[in-house]
């Protein structure tokens, strides 16, 4: 599955030769390919160690409270579902016909190069922490990549020299740094950093060849909401997006020499979202996405001098999800999110005619990037039948090629279930949709259901690879349903606003309506339903349990918000104001009272069914204290609760050893509480 992510999604644009780099944090631009239920446990590694009593032994970074032993037999049954990996397209090499990808052979994703479709992957980095994204420095084969430590999201930027393999830290090693854009000749790189105050995201410019002498601040920001998306061809101007909320963002032109800002996006009485942009080679136009005068995001070309906007994708009833402009400016590629799956399109900019492309398998497409000669289009494709892999299409011959073929643990991926789009009416007559994965027909009778709610809240569950979750379908006969409740993206900007402010709990009522729908389905067992979700989906899980405790068997909350006030007061300062725009300002007495009232912590006494709460100690978004106060409240009320804390993780688990144990513990939780 795939989850869109907040303000950063508005900046999703890729430069001509790279699919893995943009103005927002690198890892956030490629949406998660698995639901947070199991936190993307998707790559090969041996099973966790087993004790003498045949129980799986957690590693030293995990703290367990209330969890029973996970038996060896359960781990052995699940082995094949853990032994697979994914790969993501990052960029085309400017000098050689090869791809840069991220994949994982050990514990965390690293950089690899691939020289041809199906060729061997050559590993380039060997860190104990994850690589989040990368791109080539123009005109060279040197790579700039992003990395953090322990999931803390204090991203640092590094330069890897192609000739020597030497890696140089470009940033200060302490602040949060988000990769931006290179000038056309590769001399200059602009990026956003909190190094000045630790909170405000300022725009900086450096020459990566000599960062110590050239690094300087260009724009003093306020909060972490400025993202550089491109340089003008003459390297005198930066195109910058200011993200305010998922519904509102602005574009600015910034003079590199003086730092002077000129608004580029037009003033509007309504809230308008503008995505990242890309200058045409002559600097006379900017290609971008916007929902100005539209319910959905469209691909447009804006004249720099006159601000006249030319809509390139008229008549769409879906969002343009991402796009890429070739280096020479002759070709555009874009994806359209059609009911949770993406279609791929390309255009000859000179004629404005679409380029015929082969049909891409049903799923999600991300990280678009043109090869230097503007012939091959690289991207990451995820489908129900395949993990994320790097693909390319030759726009001259129409040949679609798969550059990586990630392993699936020896399982027959063609047998994995495809999603079915389902819909139901909510309390106010609004139609809510979701994706339902059914177990094989060999499982007789009404089936148990896991309801998995995405994060965001401005996100969407899209068709993709279920990964480990296929175990629930194929081995346990459990159906999985992913609702896109109100507030989700992908269904128009009006739908996104339906849960704002005091309407927050209307999205929880959508879950109640879903329970009514499940009860009316002969193939589903209304008496055996579990709810789960991560981040905002974790809040939804806790809220659903306080409202519908009697209708759920159990629940799994992953890095979820338990109290809106304490969350807003303790989320990292660089993101606090952005979250207040979405959820409300807790400093206002009336809003504070409302947020306290709807917080799951205030109604924890209503939760009597088994709960499993999972958290990363280094989470900068949802502090670990949100989990611990909820665990404490449930215990105080005599409720059954399991608690798993990872001391070396942040907002979700990224290390394979931790993912392994979480998956196995989740299986134990499901068998003990949903299936019995």
Task: Indicate where each model-derived feature is located.
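Beta-strand-rich domains and repeat architectures in extracellular enzymes and scaffolds
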Residues: 73-112, 135
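Beta-strand C-termini and the immediately following turn/loop, strongest in propeller blades
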Residues: 89, 94, 99-106, 115, ...
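N-terminal cap/lid segment of alpha/beta-hydrolase-fold proteins
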Residues: 404-443
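Short beta-strand element of the alpha/beta-hydrolase
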Residues: 445-455
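Short amphipathic alpha-helix adjacent to the substrate-entry channel of hydrolases
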Residues: 464-483
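Active-site-proximal cap/loop segments of hydrolase catalytic domains
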Residues: 475, 482-676
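The serine-hydrolase catalytic nucleophile loop
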Residues: 457-470, 625-626
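Multi-bladed beta-propeller domains
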Residues: 53-86, 114-130, 160-176, 196-198, ...
């Amino acid at each position: 599955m795939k989850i869109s992510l907040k303000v950063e999604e508005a900046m999703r644009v890729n430069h001509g030769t790279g699919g893995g780099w943009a103005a927002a944090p690198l890892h956030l631009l490629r949406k998660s390919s698995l639901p947070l239920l199991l936190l993307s446990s998707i790559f090969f590694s041996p099973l966790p160690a087993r004790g003498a009593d045949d129980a799986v032994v957690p590693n030293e970074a995990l703290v367990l409270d209330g969890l029973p032993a996970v038996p060896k037999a359960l781990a052995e049954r699940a082995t094949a579902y853990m032994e697979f990996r994914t790969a993501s397209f990052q960029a085309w090499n400017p000098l050689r016909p090869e791809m840069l990808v991220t994949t994982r052979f050990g514990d965390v994703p690293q950089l690899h190069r691939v020289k041809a479709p199906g060729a061997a992957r050559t590993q380039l980095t060997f860190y104990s922490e994850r690589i989040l994204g990368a791109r080539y420095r123009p005109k060279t084969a040197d790579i700039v990549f992003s990395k953090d430590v322990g999931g803390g999201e204090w991203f640092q930027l590094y330069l890897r020299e192609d000739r020597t393999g030497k890696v140089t830290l470009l940033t200060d090693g302490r602040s949060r740094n988000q990769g931006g854009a290179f000038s056309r000749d590769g001399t200059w790189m602009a990026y956003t950093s909190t190094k000045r105050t630790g909170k405000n995201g300022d725009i900086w410019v450096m020459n990566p060849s000599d960062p110590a002498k050239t690094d300087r601040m260009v724009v003093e920001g306020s909060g972490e909401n400025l993202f550089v998306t491109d340089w003008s061809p003459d390297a005198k101007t930066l195109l910058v997006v200011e993200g305010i909320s998922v519904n509102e963002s602005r574009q600015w032109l910034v003079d590199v020499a003086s730092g002077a800002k000129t608004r580029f996006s037009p003033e509007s009485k309504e809230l308008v979202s503008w995505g990242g942009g890309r200058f045409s080679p002559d600097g006379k136009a900017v290609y971008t996405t916007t929902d100005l005068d539209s319910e959905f995001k469209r691909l447009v070309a804006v004249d720099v001098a006159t601000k006249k906007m030319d809509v390139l994708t008229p008549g769409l009833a879906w969002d343009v999800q991402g796009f890429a402009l070739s280096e020479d400016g002759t070709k555009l590629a874009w994806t359209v999110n059609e009911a949770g799956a993406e279609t791929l399109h390309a255009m000859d900019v000179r004629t404005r005619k679409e380029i015929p492309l082969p049909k891409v398998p049903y799923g999600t497409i991300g990280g678009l990037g043109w090869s230097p000669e503007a012939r091959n289009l690289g991207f990451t494709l995820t489908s129900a039948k395949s993990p994320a892999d790097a693909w390319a299409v030759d726009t001259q011959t129409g040949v679609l090629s798969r550059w990586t073929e990630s392993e699936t643990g020896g399982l027959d991926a063609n047998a994995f279930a495809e999603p079915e789009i389902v819909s139901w009416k909510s309390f106010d007559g609004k139609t809510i949709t979701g994706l339902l994965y059914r177990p094989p027909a060999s499982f007789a009778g009404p089936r148990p259901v896991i309801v998995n709610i995405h994060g965001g809240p401005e996100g969407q569950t899209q068709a993709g690879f279920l990964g480990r979750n296929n175990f629930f379908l194929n081995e346990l006969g459990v159906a999985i349903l992913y609702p896109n409740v109100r507030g989700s993206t992908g269904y128009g900007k009006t739908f996104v606003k339906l849960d704002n402010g005091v309407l927050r709990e209307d999205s929880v009522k959508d879950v109640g309506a879903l329970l009514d729908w499940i009860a009316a389905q002969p193939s589903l067992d209304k008496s055996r339903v579990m709810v789960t979700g991560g981040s905002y989906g974790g809040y939804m899980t806790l809220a659903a349990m306080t409202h519908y405790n009697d209708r759920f068997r159990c629940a799994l909350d992953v890095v979820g918000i338990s109290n809106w006030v304490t969350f807003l007061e303790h989320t990292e300062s660089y993101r606090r104001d952005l979250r207040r725009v979405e959820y409300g300002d807790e400093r206002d007495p009336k809003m504070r009272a409302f947020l306290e009232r709807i917080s799951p912590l205030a109604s924890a006494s209503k939760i009597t069914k088994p709960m499993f709460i999972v958290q990363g100690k280094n989470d900068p978004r949802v502090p670990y204290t949100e989990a611990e106060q909820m665990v404490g409240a449930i215990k105080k009320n005599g409720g059954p609760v399991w608690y798993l804390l990872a001391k070396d993780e942040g907002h979700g688990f990224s290390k394979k050893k931790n993912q392994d144990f979480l998956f196995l513990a989740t299986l134990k939780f499901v068998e003990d509480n949903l299936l019995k």
